[in-house]
Amino acid sequence: GVRFGDRVDTMSEGKFKIKVYDPGALVAAWETFDAASKGAIDSAWTTPGYHAGKYPGLAFMTTVPFGPAISEFLSWKWMGGGNAIRDRVYAKHDLYALDCFSHGPETSGWFKKPITDLEQLKGMKMRFFGLGAKVMSKIGVSTQLLAGADIYPALERGVIDSTEYSMPTNDIKYGFYQIAKNNYFPGWHQQSSVSEFLM
């Protein structure tokens, strides 16, 4: 987001400025939809999956468990009608979005204890996102959605036993490996992920 704001400033020769706030500074990640719709914020870097509580189908606009590779997923979004569906939902709330970045498969998660079979997951408390959280709940995992910055403290305090978040190159910045030392591949729940610039 910061880099985007800097580029807009440069490209407009200072005529258009975007002030970027840290995640959660103005509203929680999953409140950006309503906040932007009501004009409390002008825009947000977000992901449609955060708004699935309002419109469950939006989860499909971010990622699909056991889903397609990023090239196929973006083809569906851009050429197969996926974004047209999203745009119709957003238009009802005076919102518009642009896909702004994507990334490849995630890991299955960071765990405090080694996992050797599904039975060990039963009763576990785990931060999990999107449709994958529904799968984990079916096998007995107590899932909750936390913003990136809230995961490490939750692991540290024992609020959660494990987490999935992103790819290791992103996860390492949050330090999950310091507490949950077991990381498993591949991330079946997010073969590719797409985020958006919501305005």
Predicted regions and their residues:
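N-terminal secretory/targeting leader peptides
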Residues: 1-73, 83-199
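Short beta-strand-centered segments that line the small-molecule binding cleft or hinge
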Residues: 76
